Regions:
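Thiol-based oxidoreductase modules, predominantly thioredoxin-like and allied folds used
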Residues: 7-9, 30-42
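Secondary-structure boundary motif
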Residues: 23-27, 48, 83
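Short, flexible active-site loop motifs that bind/organize anionic cofactors or intermediates
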Residues: 4, 36, 64
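Generic recognition of short, well-ordered alpha-helical segments
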Residues: 15-19, 44, 69
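Structural micro-motif
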Residues: 49-57
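Local sequence-structure signature of Cys/Sec-based thiol-disulfide redox active-site neighborhoods
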Residues: 1-27
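Non-catalytic, surface beta->alpha helical segment in thiol-disulfide oxidoreductase systems
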Residues: 59-84
Length: 84
């Protein structure tokens, strides 16, 4: 499974969300790719998926979560993604 987190630059809320997802992924031994919306790859994802809110967690190119979860919810989401 390929996990990507699309964030809006250095906004504090995006950085906090990045840290939450990185920790949840690290606990499960899953790699997380961080993509900034300003990058070419970020712009392509925005256009392709019609993303309008950030941050966004993608699993295998599909939107799974929008916004900032609490750490426990993030951990539960990663566990669910791994068993599905």
């Amino acid at each position: 499974m390929k996990l990507q987190l699309l964030i809006a630059g250095q906004l504090p809320s995006c950085l906090e969300t990045r840290d939450i997802w990185q920790s949840a992924c690290h606990q499960q031994g899953v790699e997380l790719e961080i993509i900034e919306l300003e990058d070419a790859q970020g712009q392509q994802l925005i256009d392709t998926l019609g993303i309008k809110s950030f941050p966004v967690l993608l699993a295998d190119g599909k939107i799974k979560v929008v916004g900032r979860p609490d750490p426990q919810r993030a951990a539960n989401i990663i566990k669910q993604l791994l068993i599905s």
